[in-house]
Protein backbone atom coordinates (compact mmCIF):
# COMPACT_ATOMS: atom_id res chain seq x y z
CA UNK A 1 0.00 0.00 0.00
CA UNK A 2 1.33 3.42 -0.95
CA UNK A 3 2.18 5.77 1.90
CA UNK A 4 -0.39 8.45 2.61
CA UNK A 5 1.48 11.64 3.44
CA UNK A 6 0.05 12.86 6.72
CA UNK A 7 0.98 16.05 8.52
CA UNK A 8 -0.28 17.92 11.53
CA UNK A 9 -0.48 21.30 13.18
CA UNK A 10 -0.33 20.94 16.94
CA UNK A 11 -0.85 24.22 18.81
CA UNK A 12 -1.06 24.58 22.57
CA UNK A 13 -4.33 26.34 23.48
CA UNK A 14 -2.68 28.92 25.71
CA UNK A 15 -4.02 31.76 23.56
CA UNK A 16 -5.01 32.64 20.01
CA UNK A 17 -2.67 32.12 17.06
CA UNK A 18 -0.10 34.86 16.46
CA UNK A 19 2.00 35.58 13.37
CA UNK A 20 4.60 32.93 14.23
CA UNK A 21 2.12 30.14 14.81
CA UNK A 22 0.32 31.04 11.57
CA UNK A 23 3.57 30.37 9.69
CA UNK A 24 3.79 26.91 11.23
CA UNK A 25 0.14 26.19 10.47
CA UNK A 26 0.43 27.27 6.84
CA UNK A 27 3.71 25.42 6.25
CA UNK A 28 2.36 22.13 7.57
CA UNK A 29 -0.84 22.53 5.52
CA UNK A 30 1.01 23.43 2.32
CA UNK A 31 3.43 20.52 2.65
CA UNK A 32 0.58 18.04 2.89
CA UNK A 33 -1.60 19.61 0.19
CA UNK A 34 1.34 19.78 -2.23
CA UNK A 35 1.69 16.01 -1.84
CA UNK A 36 -2.01 15.17 -1.94
CA UNK A 37 -2.00 14.08 1.68
CA UNK A 38 -3.99 14.41 4.90
CA UNK A 39 -3.71 17.38 7.26
CA UNK A 40 -4.66 17.06 10.92
CA UNK A 41 -5.02 19.40 13.87
CA UNK A 42 -4.01 18.27 17.35
CA UNK A 43 -4.64 20.35 20.45
CA UNK A 44 -1.63 19.93 22.69
CA UNK A 45 -3.52 20.65 25.89
CA UNK A 46 -1.60 18.13 27.99
CA UNK A 47 -0.27 20.97 30.19
CA UNK A 48 -3.74 21.79 31.44
CA UNK A 49 -2.79 24.54 33.95
CA UNK A 50 -1.42 26.66 31.09
CA UNK A 51 -4.45 26.23 28.83
CA UNK A 52 -6.80 29.19 28.45
CA UNK A 53 -10.55 28.51 28.32
CA UNK A 54 -11.88 29.20 24.83
CA UNK A 55 -8.42 29.38 23.22
CA UNK A 56 -8.80 26.10 21.33
CA UNK A 57 -12.07 27.23 19.80
CA UNK A 58 -10.49 30.55 18.85
CA UNK A 59 -7.58 28.76 17.19
CA UNK A 60 -9.92 26.54 15.17
CA UNK A 61 -11.90 29.61 14.12
CA UNK A 62 -8.74 31.39 12.95
CA UNK A 63 -7.65 28.35 10.95
CA UNK A 64 -11.09 28.01 9.36
CA UNK A 65 -11.10 31.67 8.33
CA UNK A 66 -7.84 31.02 6.48
CA UNK A 67 -9.18 27.89 4.79
CA UNK A 68 -7.01 25.58 6.91
CA UNK A 69 -9.44 22.88 7.99
CA UNK A 70 -8.45 19.57 9.53
CA UNK A 71 -9.32 16.52 7.46
CA UNK A 72 -10.44 14.71 10.62
CA UNK A 73 -11.83 15.88 13.96
CA UNK A 74 -9.05 17.43 16.07
CA UNK A 75 -7.27 15.22 18.59
CA UNK A 76 -7.07 16.47 22.19
CA UNK A 77 -4.08 15.37 24.24
CA UNK A 78 -6.06 15.80 27.46
CA UNK A 79 -8.11 12.75 26.44
CA UNK A 80 -5.08 10.57 25.69
CA UNK A 81 -3.89 9.63 29.17
CA UNK A 82 -4.49 5.90 28.70
CA UNK A 83 -2.29 5.82 25.58
CA UNK A 84 0.51 7.67 27.35
CA UNK A 85 0.22 5.36 30.34
CA UNK A 86 0.54 2.32 28.09
CA UNK A 87 3.66 3.77 26.47
CA UNK A 88 5.24 4.46 29.85
CA UNK A 89 4.41 0.93 31.01
CA UNK A 90 6.12 -0.44 27.90
CA UNK A 91 9.25 1.57 28.65
CA UNK A 92 9.25 0.49 32.31
CA UNK A 93 8.88 -3.17 31.36
CA UNK A 94 11.84 -2.83 28.99
CA UNK A 95 13.95 -1.23 31.72
CA UNK A 96 14.09 2.07 29.85
CA UNK A 97 12.19 4.27 32.33
CA UNK A 98 12.52 4.74 36.08
CA UNK A 99 10.90 6.74 38.90
CA UNK A 100 12.65 9.86 40.18
CA UNK A 101 12.33 11.47 43.62
CA UNK A 102 14.53 14.51 42.97
CA UNK A 103 13.43 18.10 43.48
CA UNK A 104 14.90 20.90 41.37
CA UNK A 105 17.05 21.93 44.31
CA UNK A 106 18.48 18.44 44.67
CA UNK A 107 19.14 18.19 40.94
CA UNK A 108 21.07 21.46 41.13
CA UNK A 109 23.10 20.27 44.11
CA UNK A 110 23.84 16.81 42.69
CA UNK A 111 24.78 18.16 39.28
CA UNK A 112 27.24 20.65 40.73
CA UNK A 113 28.69 18.03 43.09
CA UNK A 114 29.29 15.75 40.10
CA UNK A 115 30.97 18.55 38.19
CA UNK A 116 28.12 18.87 35.69
CA UNK A 117 28.26 22.60 35.07
CA UNK A 118 26.36 22.52 31.79
CA UNK A 119 23.17 24.59 31.85
CA UNK A 120 20.26 23.80 29.57
CA UNK A 121 17.60 26.49 29.33
CA UNK A 122 18.73 27.86 32.72
CA UNK A 123 18.52 24.44 34.40
CA UNK A 124 21.09 21.75 35.15
CA UNK A 125 21.13 18.60 33.05
CA UNK A 126 19.78 15.80 35.24
CA UNK A 127 22.79 13.86 36.63
CA UNK A 128 21.04 10.49 36.88
CA UNK A 129 20.73 10.46 40.66
CA UNK A 130 17.74 8.07 40.74
CA UNK A 131 18.95 5.67 38.07
CA UNK A 132 18.38 2.08 39.28
CA UNK A 133 22.08 1.24 39.10
CA UNK A 134 22.82 4.17 41.41
CA UNK A 135 20.44 3.12 44.15
CA UNK A 136 17.14 4.25 42.71
CA UNK A 137 14.73 6.04 45.00
CA UNK A 138 16.67 5.03 48.13
CA UNK A 139 13.50 5.01 50.20
CA UNK A 140 12.19 8.32 48.91
CA UNK A 141 8.78 8.83 47.33
CA UNK A 142 8.66 8.91 43.53
CA UNK A 143 7.84 12.29 42.03
CA UNK A 144 8.33 11.84 38.29
CA UNK A 145 9.29 9.26 35.66
CA UNK A 146 12.35 9.63 33.43
CA UNK A 147 13.77 7.93 30.34
CA UNK A 148 17.04 6.11 30.96
CA UNK A 149 18.79 7.70 28.01
CA UNK A 150 21.90 5.51 28.19
CA UNK A 151 19.90 2.29 28.02
CA UNK A 152 17.73 3.77 25.26
CA UNK A 153 20.78 4.51 23.12
CA UNK A 154 21.18 8.18 23.96
CA UNK A 155 24.87 7.92 24.85
CA UNK A 156 25.66 7.82 21.14
CA UNK A 157 24.71 10.65 18.83
CA UNK A 158 21.16 10.57 17.53
CA UNK A 159 21.28 11.76 13.92
CA UNK A 160 18.62 12.70 11.41
CA UNK A 161 18.24 14.72 8.23
CA UNK A 162 16.09 17.84 8.34
CA UNK A 163 14.58 18.88 5.02
CA UNK A 164 15.69 22.48 5.54
CA UNK A 165 18.45 22.43 8.16
CA UNK A 166 20.29 19.42 6.75
CA UNK A 167 22.11 16.78 8.76
CA UNK A 168 21.61 17.17 12.51
CA UNK A 169 22.98 15.26 15.47
CA UNK A 170 22.72 15.32 19.26
CA UNK A 171 24.05 13.16 22.08
CA UNK A 172 20.91 13.16 24.21
CA UNK A 173 22.46 11.80 27.40
CA UNK A 174 25.13 14.50 27.53
CA UNK A 175 23.09 17.38 26.13
CA UNK A 176 19.75 16.74 27.83
CA UNK A 177 20.11 13.95 30.35
CA UNK A 178 17.39 11.55 31.44
CA UNK A 179 14.38 13.64 30.51
CA UNK A 180 10.96 13.55 32.14
CA UNK A 181 8.17 11.36 30.78
CA UNK A 182 5.64 12.04 33.52
CA UNK A 183 5.91 15.12 35.67
CA UNK A 184 5.88 15.42 39.44
CA UNK A 185 2.40 16.99 39.25
CA UNK A 186 1.10 13.89 37.47
CA UNK A 187 0.82 15.52 34.04
CA UNK A 188 2.32 13.84 31.00
CA UNK A 189 5.44 15.39 29.53
CA UNK A 190 5.33 16.87 26.04
CA UNK A 191 8.03 14.59 24.60
CA UNK A 192 6.19 11.37 25.38
CA UNK A 193 2.79 12.73 24.37
CA UNK A 194 3.90 14.02 20.98
CA UNK A 195 5.69 10.79 20.05
CA UNK A 196 2.72 8.61 21.00
CA UNK A 197 0.27 10.88 19.20
CA UNK A 198 2.34 11.21 16.01
CA UNK A 199 2.38 7.43 15.73
CA UNK A 200 -1.32 7.09 16.56
CA UNK A 201 -2.26 9.60 13.87
CA UNK A 202 0.07 8.09 11.27
CA UNK A 203 2.11 11.27 10.90
CA UNK A 204 4.67 10.88 8.12
CA UNK A 205 5.90 14.48 7.98
CA UNK A 206 6.44 16.82 10.93
CA UNK A 207 6.59 20.43 9.75
CA UNK A 208 7.05 22.93 12.57
CA UNK A 209 9.04 25.98 13.66
CA UNK A 210 12.81 25.87 13.98
CA UNK A 211 12.58 26.51 17.73
CA UNK A 212 11.31 22.94 18.11
CA UNK A 213 14.23 21.35 16.26
CA UNK A 214 16.04 20.76 19.55
CA UNK A 215 13.28 18.34 20.59
CA UNK A 216 13.83 16.05 17.63
CA UNK A 217 16.63 13.86 18.99
CA UNK A 218 14.66 13.11 22.16
CA UNK A 219 11.61 12.24 20.11
CA UNK A 220 13.58 9.94 17.82
CA UNK A 221 15.07 8.23 20.88
CA UNK A 222 11.57 7.61 22.22
CA UNK A 223 10.34 6.40 18.82
CA UNK A 224 13.12 3.82 18.76
CA UNK A 225 12.49 2.77 22.35
CA UNK A 226 8.78 2.27 21.68
CA UNK A 227 9.24 0.66 18.27
CA UNK A 228 7.42 3.48 16.48
CA UNK A 229 8.08 4.83 12.96
CA UNK A 230 10.14 7.97 12.54
CA UNK A 231 8.53 10.72 10.45
CA UNK A 232 10.41 13.10 8.19
CA UNK A 233 11.20 16.48 9.72
CA UNK A 234 11.12 20.01 8.34
CA UNK A 235 11.76 22.97 10.62
CA UNK A 236 10.69 26.31 9.18
CA UNK A 237 12.03 29.86 9.70
CA UNK A 238 10.79 31.77 12.72
CA UNK A 239 9.06 35.10 13.04
CA UNK A 240 11.22 37.24 15.33
CA UNK A 241 10.17 39.85 17.85
CA UNK A 242 11.75 43.30 18.15
CA UNK A 243 14.37 41.89 20.54
CA UNK A 244 15.50 39.34 17.96
CA UNK A 245 14.00 36.43 19.88
CA UNK A 246 11.32 34.09 18.60
CA UNK A 247 7.94 35.80 18.56
CA UNK A 248 5.81 34.32 21.33
CA UNK A 249 3.10 35.18 23.78
CA UNK A 250 5.84 35.83 26.34
CA UNK A 251 7.41 38.69 24.37
CA UNK A 252 4.39 40.55 23.14
CA UNK A 253 2.94 38.52 20.29
CA UNK A 254 -0.64 39.57 19.63
CA UNK A 255 -3.43 37.42 18.18
CA UNK A 256 -3.73 37.52 14.41
CA UNK A 257 -6.83 39.48 13.40
CA UNK A 258 -8.99 37.77 10.80
CA UNK A 259 -10.48 40.80 9.07
CA UNK A 260 -8.28 39.95 6.04
CA UNK A 261 -7.53 36.20 6.04
CA UNK A 262 -5.88 36.30 2.60
CA UNK A 263 -3.55 39.00 3.89
CA UNK A 264 -2.71 36.83 6.90
CA UNK A 265 -1.82 34.00 4.53
CA UNK A 266 0.34 36.27 2.37
CA UNK A 267 2.27 37.48 5.42
CA UNK A 268 2.86 33.92 6.64
CA UNK A 269 3.87 32.77 3.16
CA UNK A 270 6.41 35.59 2.91
CA UNK A 271 8.26 34.18 5.94
CA UNK A 272 8.47 30.90 4.02
CA UNK A 273 9.91 32.67 0.98
CA UNK A 274 6.68 32.54 -1.02
CA UNK A 275 5.39 35.69 -2.71
CA UNK A 276 1.64 35.58 -3.24
CA UNK A 277 -0.50 37.92 -5.31
CA UNK A 278 -2.55 40.51 -3.46
CA UNK A 279 -6.25 40.87 -4.11
CA UNK A 280 -7.07 37.18 -4.42
CA UNK A 281 -9.64 35.43 -2.21
CA UNK A 282 -8.53 32.82 0.30
CA UNK A 283 -9.09 29.82 -1.98
CA UNK A 284 -7.03 31.25 -4.85
CA UNK A 285 -4.35 32.45 -2.43
CA UNK A 286 -3.96 28.95 -1.03
CA UNK A 287 -3.91 27.38 -4.50
CA UNK A 288 -1.09 29.70 -5.55
CA UNK A 289 0.79 28.93 -2.33
CA UNK A 290 0.49 25.18 -2.90
CA UNK A 291 1.92 25.51 -6.41
CA UNK A 292 4.84 27.61 -5.16
CA UNK A 293 5.52 25.20 -2.29
CA UNK A 294 5.52 22.26 -4.68
CA UNK A 295 7.97 24.03 -6.98
CA UNK A 296 10.19 25.26 -4.14
CA UNK A 297 10.19 23.38 -0.85
CA UNK A 298 9.29 19.96 -2.29
CA UNK A 299 11.90 20.30 -5.01
CA UNK A 300 14.73 20.59 -2.47
Curated annotation (Swiss-Prot):
Single GO molecular function: zinc ion binding
A Gene Ontology term for the protein's cellular component: cytosol
Enzyme class: ligase
Cross-referenced PANTHER family: GLUTAMATE--TRNA LIGASE (PTHR43311), GLUTAMYL-Q TRNA(ASP) SYNTHETASE (PTHR43311:SF1)
GO biological process: glutamyl-tRNA aminoacylation; tRNA modification
UniProt short sequence motif 'KMSKS' region, positions renumbered to this chain: 246-250
ATP-binding keyword on record: yes
Listed EC numbers: 6.1.1.-
Source organism of this protein record: Leptothrix cholodnii (strain ATCC 51168 / LMG 8142 / SP-6) (Leptothrix discophora (strain SP-6))
Residues holding ATP: 249
HAMAP family: Glu_Q_tRNA_synth (MF_01428)
Its job: Catalyzes the tRNA-independent activation of glutamate in presence of ATP and the subsequent transfer of glutamate onto a tRNA(Asp). Glutamate is transferred on the 2-amino-5-(4,5-dihydroxy-2-cyclopenten-1-yl) moiety of the queuosine in the wobble position of the QUC anticodon.
Protein name in UniProt: Glutamyl-Q tRNA(Asp) synthetase
Annotated L-glutamate binding sites: 8-12, 44, 190, 208
Lineage: superkingdom: Bacteria
InterPro entries membership: Glu-Q_tRNA(Asp)_Synthase, Glu/Gln-tRNA-synth, Glu/Gln-tRNA-synth_Ib_cat-dom, GluQ/Sye, Rossmann-like_a/b/a_fold
Keywords: Aminoacyl-tRNA synthetase, ATP-binding, Ligase, Metal-binding, Nucleotide-binding, Zinc
Similarity remark: Belongs to the class-I aminoacyl-tRNA synthetase family. GluQ subfamily.
Record motif 'HIGH' region, residues: 11-21
Sequence positions that bind Zn(2+): 100, 102, 126, 130
Required cofactor names: Zn(2+)
NCBIfam families: PRK05710.1-2, PRK05710.1-3, PRK05710.1-4, queuosine_YadB
Cofactor: binding comment: Binds 1 zinc ion per subunit.
Amino acid sequence: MAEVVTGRFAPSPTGALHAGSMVAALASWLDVRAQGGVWLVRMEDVDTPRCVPGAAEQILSQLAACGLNSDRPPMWQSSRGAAYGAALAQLVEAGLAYPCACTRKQIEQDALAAGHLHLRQAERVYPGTCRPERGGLAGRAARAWRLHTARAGGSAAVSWSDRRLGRRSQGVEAAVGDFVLRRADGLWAYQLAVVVDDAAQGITDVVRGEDLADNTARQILLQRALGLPMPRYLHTPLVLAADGQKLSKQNGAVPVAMDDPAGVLRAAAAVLGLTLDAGRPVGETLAQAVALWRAGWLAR
